[in-house]
């Protein structure tokens, strides 16, 4: 079993973990209904994508 020969310093440990953070998803605004939506996807509230209705949504 492999065992480290020297203690890993706090600096080296933190540099190794520097890229492990989570990034927030990018959000854009739907031009039709002005609700937030993910880019390159149809709007969840109105069902439009690039000015066309691609998903039928029922009004409640």
From Swiss-Prot:
Q: Which GO terms describe its molecular function?
A: structural constituent of ribosome
Indicate the segments annotated as coiled coil, or none if absent: none
Pfam families noted in UniProt: Ribosomal_L32p
Q: Which GO terms describe its cellular component?
A: large ribosomal subunit
GO BP annotation list: translation
Which keywords does this Swiss-Prot/TrEMBL entry list? Ribonucleoprotein, Ribosomal protein
Q: Which family does it belong to?
A: Belongs to the bacterial ribosomal protein bL32 family.
Q: Which NCBIfam families match?
A: rpmF_bact
The record's section on PANTHER family has: 50S RIBOSOMAL PROTEIN L32 (PTHR35534), LARGE RIBOSOMAL SUBUNIT PROTEIN BL32 (PTHR35534:SF1)
Q: What is this protein called?
A: Large ribosomal subunit protein bL32
Organism expressing this protein natively: Geobacter sulfurreducens (strain ATCC 51573 / DSM 12127 / PCA)
Q: Which gene encodes it?
A: rpmF
